């Protein structure tokens, strides 16, 4: 049986390309996306669920119905200027949404989680190439929200002895 990967934000640019590549490699792909910025035409999945990562009841239904082996989490608001004007929207969507997703995944026994973070967690780095060991000091609500999720994931996954990968795109 093929392993099942839940891709959040799978109707967006990076998420849709990732979903396609996962399918090409034989994984069963389930996309969860609210289509707030993604596109229905970009979806390539074995199953598409239109919904929001903040919807706890929906997440519970998904994890009860589908045997998810791993989560690849792209779903997020990501416009820096908008995050400055509406910071609480970014914390609600990016941080609260991630917390609900992480909690549901752990409760369902998912042991692998990949999180798409951002180079914005490094702030105004003074280097052309930013190394992973550079101090993280975001300078806007978008970067702060992604950094908060990184910290939350590290704590949650250490406590539960699970596998976590962070990608700074």
Task: Say what each PLM segment does.
Residues 1-166:
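N-terminal Rossmann-like NAD(P)+-binding domain of SDR-like oxidoreductases, especially those catalyzing
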